[in-house]
């Protein structure tokens, strides 16, 4: 396991699940409007201004996780999408549901660019897929994440 990721997980009370969910929501908003990565940063700035109540529920480490994830996803947006496209067999990226795309973007960023353990990411992303997607979302997302993991080895 990546030592920095483990430290970040331990420091955040209750882990980073809440922050990860908020990252997903921001990415979902950008994907739903088919915006560019630059708009992810703008959406994040607006989010920070309008979400004082939620921001108050995040501890310092969760907020840092949220900020660094948004920055990292915005910087690597095109690369992340390319990785997902290469690992979706017989699926055009545009045909993937917005919920599933957003979840895959968050998971791919953490796994590839932060070297976070796939087991941790997959478990939380699958839970989010069950909560926000349809009854097949988690299976689809899990399959693509398995392909991404294989391609990284």
UniProtKB/Swiss-Prot annotation:
Transmembrane segments: none
Pfam families in alphabetical order: NusB
Domain of life assignment: Bacteria
InterPro entries per UniProt: NusB-like_sf, NusB_fam, NusB_RsmB_TIM44
GO molecular function: RNA binding
This protein's UniProt keywords: RNA-binding, Transcription, Transcription antitermination, Transcription regulation
Gene Ontology CC: cytosol
GO biological process: DNA-templated transcription termination; transcription antitermination
Role of this protein: Involved in transcription antitermination. Required for transcription of ribosomal RNA (rRNA) genes. Binds specifically to the boxA antiterminator sequence of the ribosomal RNA (rrn) operons.
Family annotation (HAMAP family): NusB
Family classification: Belongs to the NusB family.
PANTHER family attached to this UniProt entry: ANTITERMINATION NUSB DOMAIN-CONTAINING PROTEIN, N UTILIZATION SUBSTANCE PROTEIN B-RELATED
Entry protein name: Transcription antitermination protein NusB
Species name: Fusobacterium nucleatum subsp. nucleatum (strain ATCC 25586 / DSM 15643 / BCRC 10681 / CIP 101130 / JCM 8532 / KCTC 2640 / LMG 13131 / VPI 4355)
